[in-house]
Curated annotation (Swiss-Prot):
This is Sodium-dependent phosphate transporter. Belongs to the inorganic phosphate transporter (PiT) (TC 2.A.20) family. Residues 556-571 have a biased composition (Basic and acidic residues). It comes from the Eukaryota.
């Protein structure tokens, strides 16, 4: 107990050097704790903005770094009384200031450890509850049970349920009203402009109230304030927050007036910024329509239709339109099942009864093969995406997605390969073609399905070069519907064979491992050399497609196969479904910009390495690994965490996340762009307001240690110099930049589907929940409110959203089906409940973990025996 006696000295003024190590260690620990707070709690502020693609991740980090630093430096004076008023009564440690210093150091360590663990797991936890739990463990371990404010502990336990429920109700109410009044109206953008000043006023009012009632700047006036115990204290000079408490009516009027002034200024700025985005989107739409002309049936008639290859699908709505058929989800499923069964039966019949003999087009208009890589021409892909015979169908909610049926896709590829086989057996080889038509036994025509694989694998399947048949005549350019009119006519022996639109897709899926045989010098000198090379490549692709119709092996490039050991090739080989992607380079700034998209408007997220292998990009090793110092520096910069594509990562980590991201109701694109500007303003003001409280959680214990060390007593007021506040703000900004993407991905991508309109409702609901409960006097966690509001908005998704364009007009003489619109109040399938359950459990563990770690560290530091010289 000798150590306890030494730590129980009534004052530190006599020997401050003995406790200098506590101040030094506390400074380092304060930096790490602030780093973890920035990566967790500050990330919640911009999670909905990044999740909705209103701003990219790097822009959110840059904005938060500036706003957090400014807010912590100017408004971070709240650390003065934050620790004193939360959970610990400092008056108990008036006679033992050294114990207070040791306990605060242990509290920083305990809270920091839990926050780093939560950041690693991507769990959004309350940093306020972390530091409160650490202080609770310190108070209990010190033996001063009366130092703990148990009323605050009871409020915290109740807030685990009250905060998410209240924020969910607020966010859901705002979103439902916004959806009914604006998003589902006939002219949503015009209505959004009319409601703009109301939205901005609701944002600025919460910020103004915080600025007036939580401001710790001092005024040269006197004020009286009632403190704990019923005593009234006189303060001169008086802080703005204390003056506001003493003159609540006047302070509220000032807050309203300040909010009106901010609304006028910010509304003008937001209006210009929002319509800059809208006009940019319209210009891109015009350029896209000029560069990629489509049929009139494929083009959208309104601004809500997405550009080709974009992420936005056709908007869906629960509002039925007159004269349009609105089948339900069950009817849609039955209709799609019937179409699928009919298509499979037709494919089987064609396999058993092949079509008449025809020859493949020598120009290979629908298939382009070069150096072992196959790709489909753009008109073919567009036709495949829009044709009724394509392999794409509508899901139960109406979005156009690829058919994932393994059986259907396998049979489709087998059908395409069979069609290619029947076309290729007569390809420009007149002896074989004519002999097969005459029934010559030397050239047997293998028609049966069982002999199809044998034909492809046999050496005789290759077509020998031969001179053109005398009966062949040059064909006109109009003979092939896919050939551009400007191309010259090319002679062929027979009429072009009809090739299914998915034949290029089948061949492209096997191009990485179905490398066509090299062209010999003899073949290259003959006129049929190029034609034979194209046909051999097609047969090689069909062979691999028949052997493995659904999956393609991502093996190393054939030219570099010898450089890779066989064991490594076998270990690194993976099976994946390859579809011909198209990288979209133009998109609104940080808004709905997919990583890789398809012409059928579906999405697939592929890493750069897999994409390079699947497309056979042929990038040299010098480009992959830059040798110059500038190239290495640029590559290192692009690999930083703030350039991560969290949407792609979240969708590939969990299939449920991908379903949530594609199954939500889609609103007008321009209206969403308009709300993205409002969402950025809301996130910025929330970042400034939260920076003061977040700084208090990290700087508060360190400020207490520094004040006790400088004054030598624990009863003095805790100071907070500006340089300490600046230090805390910079530390939080660095933590957000390096580790904040984990929590942003959890809340903004993996929990529910977030768009700008939804994200704005979430932020507004969370802000008003904190404001109302703070006015009542009930402490809440901003993290709990943010997550609760996110879940509440997600629950408002309709179960079966339908396309806004409907299924077409009702046929003449047919009565439209009268069916009630089904818009359920709550849709539990639109929330990732497994993830939310883990987040809720982490909220409960927060206080327990921090308290146990802090109590263990303090017990070891204060009560462990030590050697005395």
């Amino acid at each position: 107990m000798e150590a306890v006696a030494e730590l129980s000295a009534p004052s530190l003024a006599g020997a401050p050097g003995e406790y200098t190590w506590i101040v030094a260690v506390a400074g380092v620990t304060c930096f790490l704790t602030a780093f973890a707070i920035g990566a967790n709690d500050v990330a919640n502020t911009f999670s909905s903005s990044v999740g909705s693609r209103a701003i990219p991740l790097w822009a959110a980090i840059g904005m938060s770094a500036v706003l957090e630093t400014v807010g912590a430096t100017l408004l971070g004076g709240a650390v003065t009384d934050s620790i004193r008023s939360k959970i610990i009564d400092f008056e108990v440690f008036r006679e033992t200031p050294s114990i207070l210093m040791t306990g605060m150091l242990c509290a920083l360590v305990g809270a920091g450890l839990w926050l780093f663990l939560a950041n690693h797991l991507g769990l959004p936890v309350s940093t306020t509850h972390s530091i409160i739990g650490a202080l609770l463990g310190f108070g209990l371990a010190s033996g001063n049970v009366r130092a703990v404010k148990w009323t605050q502990v009871a409020f915290i336990v109740g807030s685990w349920v009250a905060a998410p429920l209240a924020a969910s109700a607020a966010g859901a109410t705002i979103f439902v009203c916004m959806r009914r009044l604006i998003l589902r109206s006939r002219q949503p953008l015009r209505r959004a402009k009319r409601f703009l000043w109301i939205f901005i006023y609701l944002i600025t009012l919460t910020f103004s109230v915080f600025l007036v009632f939580k401001n710790f700047f001092e005024l040269n006036v006197s004020c009286d304030q009632m403190v704990a115990g019923g005593r009234v204290e006189h303060f001169e000079p008086c802080r703005i927050s204390r003056w506001a408490d003493a003159h609540s009516g006047t302070a509220l009027g000032i807050a309203v007036a300040l909010s009106v002034a901010l609304t006028f200024v910010i509304s003008c700025l937001v209006y210009r910024f929002a319509f800059y985005r809208v006009e940019s989107y319209r210009r891109r739409q015009k350029r896209s329509s000029r560069t990629e002309p489509r049929d009139a049936s494929e083009e959208g008639t309104g601004p809500s239709h997405a550009r080709p290859g974009g992420l936005l699908l056709t908007p869906r709505s629960c509002v039925a339109k007159e004269g349009e058929r609105r089948p339900g989800a069950l009817e849609d499923a039955l209709r799609l099942a019937g179409e699928e069964n009919a298509r499979i039966a037709s494919a089987e019949s064609r396999l058993q009864k092949p079509p008449p003999l025809e020859c493949m087009d020598t120009c290979a208009d629908s298939l382009q093969i070069n150096d072992g890589r196959a790709a489909a021409a753009k008109p073919d892909v567009g036709t495949a995406a829009q044709s009724p015979e394509s392999r794409f169908a509508a899901d139960p909610v109406g979005s156009s997605v690829p058919d994932r049926s393994v059986l259907a896709f396998s049979r489709s590829l087998a059908e395409d390969a069979q069609a290619a086989f029947h076309a290729s057996v007569q390809h420009c080889a007149s002896p074989r073609c004519s002999a097969a038509s005459r029934g010559d036994s030397r050239y047997p025509l293998q028609r049966s399905t069982s002999d199809f694989s044998a034909f492809l694998s046999s050496p005789s399947s290759s077509v020998p070069p031969s001179s053109p048949s005398p009966s062949s005549t040059p064909s006109s350019p109009s003979a092939s519907p896919r050939r551009p009119p400007s191309r010259p006519p090319v002679p062929r022996t027979c009429s072009p064979a009809p090739v299914s639109p998915s034949v290029p897709r089948a061949f492209a899926s096997t191009a990485t491992h179905g490398h066509p045989p090299a062209l010999s010098d003899t073949d290259a000198d003959t006129p049929e050399g190029p034609d034979r090379r194209r046909q051999s490549a097609a047969l090689a692709g069909a062979k691999d497609a028949e052997a493995s119709p659904l999956f393609a092996d991502l093996a190393p490039h054939p030219e570099r196969r010898d450089e890779v050991p066989a064991a490594k090739r076998e270990r690194d080989a993976r099976r994946t479904l390859l579809l011909p992607p198209r990288v979209t380079g133009e998109a609104p700034e940080g808004f709905f910009a997919p990583t890789v998209s398809h012409d059928d408007n579906g999405l697939v997220f592929v890493s750069q390495a897999d994409l390079a292998d699947s497309l056979g990009s042929g990038v040299d090793e010098e480009e992959d690994a830059p040798r110059s110092w500038r190239g290495k520096l640029k590559a290192a910069w692009r690999s930083m965490p703030w350039f991560k594509d969290i949407h792609a990562e979240g969708s590939t980590e969990d299939d449920l996340v991908a379903r949530l991201q594609t199954g939500a109701e889609v609103f007008d694109t321009e209206t969403e762009l308009f709300f993205s500007a409002c969402q950025v303003v809301s996130a910025c003001m929330g970042c400034i307001a939260h920076s003061a409280n977040d700084t208090a959680n990290a700087i508060g214990p360190f400020a207490a240690i520094l004040t006790v060390y400088q004054s030598g007593s624990a009863d003095s007021e805790i100071g907070s110099p500006w340089y300490i506040l600046l230090f805390g703000g910079l530390s939080m900004s660095l933590g957000l930049a390096l580790l904040g993407y984990r929590v942003i991905k959890t809340v903004g991508v993996k929990l529910v589907k977030i768009t700008p309109a939804r994200g704005f409702s979430m932020e507004l609901g969370a802000a008003w929940t904190v404001l109302i409960f703070s006015a009542i006097g009930i402490p809440l966690s901003t993290t709990h409110c943010a997550v609760g509001s996110t879940v509440g908005v997600g629950l408002m998704e309709p179960k079966h959203p339908r396309r806004e364009t409907g299924d077409g007009p009702v046929a003449e003489g047919e009565e439209p089906k009268k069916r009630a619109v089904q818009c359920p109040v709550i849709n539990t399938a639109s929330v990732n409940w497994k993830l939310f359950g883990g987040v809720f459990v982490s909220w409960i563990i927060t206080i327990a973990f921090s308290a146990l770690v802090t109590a263990a560290l303090f017990s070891f530091a204060a009560y462990s025996p030590r050697m005395v010289s």
